[in-house]
């Protein structure tokens, strides 16, 4: 699809923000062999608790009942499949065309990481683009609109440690720090 769009619209640099690409690296690298890929890494427990909470809120709007067990099981399995494929296939993208960005490195260090990403991709980070990013970051601090309190145990009947135990392979491969359930159950 992207090749078809590029054909009609002329050559462009595509920026795709989706962790699902980690599950499709063989197809991505075969289709776009010169792609630069930024791999973002975060505690899967934080991702899962956010996803299942969001889905539960959405389900309240369109369903008469919610199945918390189904939500936690489905999304834990889904994220496990995605990350398993990403770990298995990560080396398909050579170091000179990829960068790994851990969530704990990103917060408060966005511009430095942005510079690294632009450099790796061979794209000029112009002063205007840098200023736009700085303006966006200044206007949108983390927690600007408040925060959501998560409680996997209470809402979904599973502890962060139970969920995390399925992802040792991911923590072993990448620089990922636990965010959930590591300080007296706080997120």
Residue ranges, per PLM feature:
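PAPS-dependent sulfotransferases, especially Golgi type II membrane carbohydrate sulfotransferases
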Residues: 2, 9-14, 51-100, 104-187
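Flexible, glycine/threonine-enriched loop-and-boundary segments that flank and lead into catalytic domains
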Residues: 6-34
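Conserved phosphate-donor/acceptor-positioning beta-strand/loop module used by diverse small-molecule
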Residues: 17, 28-53
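Active-site-proximal structural scaffolding
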Residues: 18-21, 30-33, 40, 79, ...
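Flexible loop/turn segments at secondary-structure boundaries
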Residues: 21-25, 45-48, 107-110
């Amino acid at each position: 699809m992207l090749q078809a769009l590029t054909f009609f619209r002329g050559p462009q640099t595509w920026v795709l923000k989706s962790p699902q690409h980690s599950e499709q690296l063989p197809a991505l690298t075969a289709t776009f062999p010169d792609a630069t890929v930024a791999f973002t890494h975060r505690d899967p427990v934080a991702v899962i608790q956010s996803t299942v909470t969001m889905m539960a809120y959405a389900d309240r709007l369109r369903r008469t009942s919610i199945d918390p067990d189904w939500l936690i099981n489905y999304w834990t399995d889904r994220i496990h499949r995605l990350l398993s494929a990403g770990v298995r296939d990560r080396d398909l993208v050579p170091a000179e065309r990829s960068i790994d960005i851990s969530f704990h490195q990103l917060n408060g260090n966005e511009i430095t990481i942005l510079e690294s990403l632009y450099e790796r991709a061979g794209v000029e980070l112009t002063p205007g683009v840098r200023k736009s990013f700085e303006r966006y970051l200044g206007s949108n601090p983390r927690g600007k609109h408040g925060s959501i309190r998560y409680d996997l145990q209470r809402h979904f009947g599973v502890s962060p440690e139970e969920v995390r135990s399925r992802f040792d392979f991911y923590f072993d491969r990448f620089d990922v720090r636990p965010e959930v359930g590591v300080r007296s159950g706080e997120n």
